Amino acid sequence: VKTLAVNLALALLIAVSALTVTPTAHADMLVGNYTANTDRDRGHNWLWAVRPCTTRQPGCVTVQSVPQPNGQAAWWQADAHLANGRYTMAVDVPDGVRCVVQFFPSHDVYSWDAVSLSGELVTTYDTGCGGGPGGTDTYPFTLMRW
């Protein structure tokens, strides 16, 4: 009886140890509000409201980006997907190219590290300010949860 009790206790200890040291397959971003810090548009700060995707798929978060101050900047929403430790999302922004009196659309791709919350924004556009040619610009950015 004593041997059986010792064996059961040992088996339970091994099972609990295995559960506590098993790494998770993915690191979902914490739900909450973040400030997106970038030099892309110095006239606005961007607040990100991050929540799970409606599909509840692991490694998927929905980002709703709200400009502060709110005047003359459009909010947007997109899903970000986790792969190889990085989140990536693409969004078409109606006023991504912000000139003095005109705004033009852009296609933006955000990619950031799931742990450090730092990454880059690559923005592609067909028309530049002052009727200039289209192009692609890259900006570093960081996220800070608050």
Protein language model annotation of sequence segments:
Residues 28-30, 36-105, 131-146:
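Central antiparallel beta-sheet cores of small beta-barrel/beta-sandwich binding domains
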Residues 22-35, 111:
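N-terminal helix-cap/turn-to-beta initiation motif at the start of protein domains
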Residues 105-127, 137:
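Internal, hydrophobic beta-strand segments that form the core of beta-sheet-rich folds
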Residues 1-27:
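Secretory targeting and sorting signals
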